[in-house]
Design a protein with these regions (language model features):
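Hydrophobic helix-and-loop "lid/oligomerization" segment in the mid-to-C-terminal part
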Residues: 1-111, 116-147
């Protein structure tokens, strides 16, 4: 199929960029800030990042500007699970989970009242960011040791 696009002069790279790669300046700023503030835990098997309401206000970001950040965390070398907390209220977080190989994040999300599938899931949780992460990593550890 690719040679046909090339022969017909269709600018397929332009469409790939526009559909999958381009982001707004706000999205780029929010991504950069989130990646810089991320941390690895569990001997580097898990990466965690938080997007606060203050960050969202500072960058004048909308909820849709967060899209794709969890995937950038997930592709970090050596990481099995990525956790992204998005603060939506006082001590309330929308949690996104992504897995690379053997951790079933849908089981974790289901335990906390959310849903998804094996490699991508989410839920909402109340508590401090630290407490939320501690609750989640306990479930990740139990799957790691029982694989």
């Amino acid at each position: 199929a690719l040679p046909i696009f090339i022969e017909t002069g269709i600018p397929f790279w332009k469409y790939i960029d526009e559909c999958f790669l381009q982001r707004t300046y706000t999205q780029t700023q929010l991504l950069g800030r989130t990646l810089l503030a991320s941390m690895r835990v569990m001997d580097g098997k898990c990466i965690v990042a938080t997007i606060t309401r203050r960050m969202m206000e500072f960058y004048e970001a909308k909820t849709e500007d967060i899209e794709g950040i969890i995937d950038q965390l997930r592709i970090t070398q050596g990481v099995e699970v990525a956790i992204l907390l998005h603060e939506i209220g006082d001590q309330e977080y929308k949690v996104s989970l992504r897995s690379n190989n053997y951790i079933d994040v849908s089981k974790i999300a289901s335990f906390f009242g959310g849903g998804g599938h094996v490699k991508a899931a989410g839920f909402t949780m109340r508590g401090s960011a630290h407490d939320v992460v501690n609750n989640i990593t306990g479930h990740i550890e139990s799957q790691m040791f029982n694989k």
